[in-house]
Amino acid sequence: MTPGNFSAELLDAMIAAGCQSIDFGTDAGSDRTLRAFRKSFTVDDIRAASAICRARGFPFCHSLVFGGEGESWETVAETIALMDECRPTAVTAMCGVRVYPETPMAQALLARGEVPGVEALYEPWFYVAPGVRDGLAERVREAARARGNWLLPGMKVNDEERLFARLRGRGLKGDLWRYVSRLRLGRALAAAE
């Protein structure tokens, strides 16, 4: 779900249809980074969508991708601060943008010589902006450790898989990120790194 064009009326219709939570494909919390990702929404749209969900007590998650083109320590800080302001039920944060062949991003990176060759893109290949390449994963881990509602897929994935299997075994249903804040799992998972 995109935060752009989200409305209270849309949320009401989703609730009436049985929706139990929303995962926004937010990607970033900086207008500069959102433009680089060619997103059709702004930071103000993210704030508004979050406020609508909070006003109704509706569980929501913002999924983020740190390290995209043009990412800087300033935009990383803006994204973290926006998540603190928006107070989502959970934040799913990843480092690095998966680059697929034959996409505008792949073509731009190939033209600049930042990808070893198109063949490299047929396997999982992730781009991290040079300005944040050193230290980005640790900065995101620090943000997660300081908050109880952040999940970091790919950083200790086996522990998360075992935890989520146990939660499912206890009968928990739906988006498991909904339980992260309530059970303080995000901080525990980040600390296990």
Regions found by a protein language model. Give the residues of each.
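Conserved SAM/AdoMet-binding glycine-rich loop
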Residues: M1-C61, F66-G68
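Soluble or luminal CAZymes and related metallo-dependent hydrolases
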Residues: F6, D45, E71-T75, V132-L136
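Catalytic cores of alpha/beta
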Residues: E9-A13, E69-E85
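Proline-aspartate-enriched helix->loop->beta-strand connector
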Residues: C19, P88-T89
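Flexible glycine/acidic-rich beta-alpha junction loops that bind and position SAM and/or redox cofactors
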Residues: R32, A36-F37, F66-E74, T89-A120, ...
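A structural motif corresponding to the C-terminal end of an alpha-helix
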Residues: A49-F60, C86, L136-L151
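Generic recognition of well-ordered alpha-helical segments
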Residues: A49-I52, A81-L82, G96
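Radical SAM enzyme core and accessory elements
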Residues: T103-E193
